[in-house]
């Protein structure tokens, strides 16, 4: 199972979520439309607690990527891995006023997909996160795409598959 947090202008039926479902993944995508970060974090934490027994992959895109990164740090033992798509890790908003504290939790395999043409969230944000996180970054896909990653669904599916494979192998 993948729990996917959509972006600020995204929806629970966005193209990334649809692509993952079409590839056979069970995806739970809560509706965060109109919520600020603290509300998203609270809702996602509740949902993740409800599904902790499944050890899902936690995923997020843009603002949802920031939400997922925060939740992964709060409750790392509950997830198989972390999949971040153009995560907005540079935003300073409660509950995270210092973006440099964000890291992939120790031992949590993490995949990042970020477009080199992203004009909304600089790829440098993901590169700095990966550097702070060290060896827990399983894959980093620098794709020839923009912020929406509309041409990179195959990389997203590949990343999810790699994280799922970690579950099978362990």
Language-model features: where?
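A conserved short beta-strand
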Residues: 77-92
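Short alpha-helix in the alpha/beta-hydrolase fold that links the catalytic acid
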Residues: 16-17, 97, 122-131
């Amino acid at each position: 199972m993948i729990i996917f947090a959509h972006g600020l202008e995204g929806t629970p039926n966005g193209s990334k979520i649809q692509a993952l479902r079409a590839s056979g993944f069970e995806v739970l995508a809560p509706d965060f439309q109109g919520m600020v970060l603290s509300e998203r974090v609270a809702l996602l934490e509740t949902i993740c607690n409800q599904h902790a027994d499944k050890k899902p992959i936690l995923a997020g895109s843009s603002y949802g990527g920031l939400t997922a990164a925060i939740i992964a740090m709060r409750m790392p033992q509950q997830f198989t891995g972390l999949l971040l798509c153009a995560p907005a890790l540079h935003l300073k908003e409660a509950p995270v006023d210092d973006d440099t504290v964000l890291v992939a939790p120790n031992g949590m395999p993490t995949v990042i997909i970020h477009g080199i043409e992203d004009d909304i969230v600089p790829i440098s944000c993901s590169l700095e996160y990966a550097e702070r996180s060290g060896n827990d970054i399983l894959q980093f896909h620098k794709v020839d795409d923009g912020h929406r990653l509309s041409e990179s669904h195959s990389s997203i599916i590949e990343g999810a598959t790699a994280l799922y494979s970690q579950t099978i192998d362990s």
